[in-house]
């Protein structure tokens, strides 16, 4: 699928792929970050590697991953002023008889508490079911991350269970809560499902 065709608008956000002309906004979003607020937040970090050449490579890599149906990464732009406030993705877990994807969303810390995460998750569900043809979407969340758990619940996800020792983080295997949402009958795109 052509990555540039995946665009969603929510009341506050535009979710779309990065374009070459977005470099300054992309960089400004990360420059605006304050110190990390919790263990899930990268906060401020060295931005020296975020050169224009690096950025061009990022855009090319994201397009290749979309064409190969590996992942679809979109940036979050605030509609009122075009500020880059985060990014999100839908990653293919398995196609065929499963049509199973995973979503993720990162809102940069200056923009927390404004409902952007919930809007993003809802938009990803719509994209995942309608444009990408997934039947099942899931999200993986640390047990001690109640903010992300609330976002997913507000977006219609249901807590399905816990995967033990699921993700290797900071030198240890961590358990993750699994939240899922299933496409309503007929919601999956027939074209995306190969029908």
Say what each PLM segment does.
Residues 46-47, 59-75:
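A short helix-loop-beta-strand connector motif used in the catalytic cores of GNAT acetyltransferases and
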Residues 1-39, 73-195:
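Acyl-donor (CoA/ACP) binding surface of acyl/acetyltransferases
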Residues 36-60:
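Conserved GNAT-fold acetyl-CoA-binding loop/helix
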